[in-house]
Amino acid sequence: MDSPSNSIQNLQQEAQGSSSAQLADHDHDRVSMAMPLQTDQSVSVSQSSDNLRRSRRVPKPRTSIYDEYEEELKERANKPKRKRPAPPKKKAPSTQNSKSNDKVEKKKTTSIAKDGKPTLKTNDKKVAPKPKPAHEQVEPALIPSNWTSVIPLLTSDFKNQYSVISRLKNPNMKPVPYAGDIIKLMAFINKFSSFFHSDLQNLSFQDFEVGLDLYPGDPNGSAAGIVKGPEDTSLLLYPDFMAIKDIVYCQDKMNLLFLSLLDLTFTENFDGKSAKKKGPLTTWENLKSSSKKVFSNPLYRLRLVAREWGYPREWRQQLPSDQDISKPKTALFEQDEQTPVVDPSHPEILTPNIYTWNANEPLPLESNPLYNREMDKNGILALKPMDRVVLLRALTDWCASHSSAIHDEIYKLTHGKKDPVFGIQTQQVPRYTIEGVDNTINQFKKLCSLIQSRYEIRSKKKHFVKQLKEGKKPDLSRKLEILKEIKAELKNAVKSEKDELLFSLYDKWVPLFEGELPDQPLANPFSERLYKLRLQEFFLGRVPHIGDFYMPRLHSYGDSLEMSTFTDLRNLQALLSKFKNNEYNAFTLFENDGQSMSAQFKLFYHDTPSLAHDVARGRNTSGKVYWYELCHDSATLLEFLEFLDYKIVKPQDEKKEGNEKEKEALNNEAHILEQKSTTDNNPSINTNPLPKDAKYNTARKKLQILKEFLSDYYFILRQFEQMKVQFADMKPGKRQLRRIQRQTVNYNTEYDSEEYVDDEEDDEADIYDDNDNDSSFDDGRVKRQRT
């Protein structure tokens, strides 16, 4: 225990300490109040030494920013790059019932199980993910140009291809330089058939040759006759193997065609409607009239305008081949005036030289075929054979350019409500002639599956379902019912028979195509006016590295044709199969207006690659032959089909192994020896196959398609030839003749012979009357008289 004296001393010290502390606090307050005055007056205070702040009056020394941050920049450069953080997950969209922002949602705590996988606690609730909105199925797109019944025929297909004529060398192959002109005439008659007489609508290529006295050339060049055979090279003229009346009939047809073209060129106020009502403008009566001005009047008008319209190339003065047409022919002055011009801005004060340039002027009047005065009496037969073809071709061009009736018809064909989906192309051909029958049918099947999926997807869409329930889509409802019937029939069919059944349900598929596509692969290309003007009706096929094939036959367009080969693929196949199975014959053709079509045919090969390259390079094509005859009747057609077998077969590969290689080598040698023997015996045929290069594989396929098509075509062509022989002078119709009608038989042997003879004569007279009524020569050409 402290003593009282010590405690008193301690109390006194505490009191002094507290008083000194109060004085210190009081002094501190005074210092703090006086500090600002002191800092304002002193300017030498340093913050680094005294840890005091710098005076505002002291300027801050200028330092480089790079110096200040140099070390920091070095540290950042040496520091390794951080990995890019993963993008944050998107938050679920907030809803109206979500909690307010001031309430923070508690995070779900997870506990780690023994296996290391996080598990939710028992009090946590599982949140089911929201279902994604279902996307509507999109209807498959349909490109109209891929599903048309007609395909454009482009010359650019042969841009990098070259043909070799000798590959198709066979005994029946003949150069025909006039084939292109006659095919052009036949195409003009075919497209504007309403302006021509019915006897001109079934002309065959042979009718033109006989009527114009033209002969196809032999393999060595043009000839003035037809070669009798490979062994006998003597030439035959048409009177040597044809009846004179048939030759005269063909010549009369050519004069009728010539007069029809003349009248059609200069006629006015005549169109297709008046031709259907009143008939053709020119008939046999006009040709056989006693007037001497049948040809003279239209020929007089033609001679006046021919120079303005333009003469054909063959009737113009030909320029010498060694003459440069870019240089003038003659000059009025020997040298041009070279006096310097005083005023260069007016050089016309000098006398210019007058030049005469080369021009393809028409032939002189004495050698111009158009001014042949014999044409006023004999028509086109007054000219030479090749001049006849040239004049008919020129008349076709003049008629198409200046005839008002043809202009009106062309305007109707080119100004329809719709245009071709593939654009305006110069030439168009049916799809099955390019792609073949099987590929065209497969295209139709693909289209059916696409159309079915489009309707099925459409029927499930909400707005369509609503409209169907309200009855606002009757057309769609009807199509869905048709589709339902088709699916029911296909469902019950066997898998192997589905393709045939799908093909047989064509009539039910057609309404489903309406409104979806303007055309479809199996439609009839000859019934659509949209394609009529540019359609190549005589086209048969195109083979790469070889060329095109044509079979000119009339006529393609007509409402009365019941057995026409110019129809859609379905009807054509059905017709060809019936002739192939002998269900139809020549008499069936005769009953169903078979004589309104060409009874004869010729198959031609067109060297399109050579023509395309010659035209592109600016070469002169006159005098060159691009058309070749391959067959002219059903017998030579069979020979051509056998010839195609040599070209379709692919050469065997030389790489063989072991004994098979030796055996096949021996077989190949034997086969080569056989080929050499055949070619040696018959050098006019080339039996070598196409080259083994892979680029010729497409050519082999196309030749196979052409062979199959011609093989089916053979049977109907043979019946047409038989019909021409059996029913040459008879008018077609379904009325049976008296001689083939079934008559009652008299079994009584006791009859008066004189009575029988009288009855027989009466029957013959009746038959004669019928033949007079049915004869095709009762229209001003030849008339029979009863005796």
Curated annotation (Swiss-Prot):
Residues 1-137, 672-693, 749-787 are annotated as: Disordered. Pfam families: WHIM1. It comes from the Eukaryota. InterPro entries: WHIM1_dom. Residues 751-777 have a biased composition (Acidic residues). One of its GO terms (biological process) is chromatin remodeling. Residues 79-92 have a biased composition (Basic residues). GO terms for cellular component: Isw1 complex; Isw1a complex. Residues 100-137, 778-787 have a biased composition (Basic and acidic residues). Keywords: Nucleus, Transcription, Transcription regulation. Disulfide bonds: none annotated. It is found in: Nucleus. Its main location: nucleus. Residues 1-22, 675-689 have a biased composition (Polar residues). Residues 40-50 have a biased composition (Low complexity). Functions as a component of the ISW1A complex, which acts in remodeling the chromatin by catalyzing an ATP-dependent alteration in the structure of nucleosomal DNA. The ISW1A complex represses gene expression at initiation through specific positioning of a promoter proximal dinucleosome. Component of the ISW1A complex, which at least consists of ISW1 and IOC3. Present with 1770 molecules/cell in log phase SD medium. This is ISWI one complex protein 3. The lineage of its organism: Eukaryota, Fungi, Dikarya, Ascomycota, Saccharomycotina.
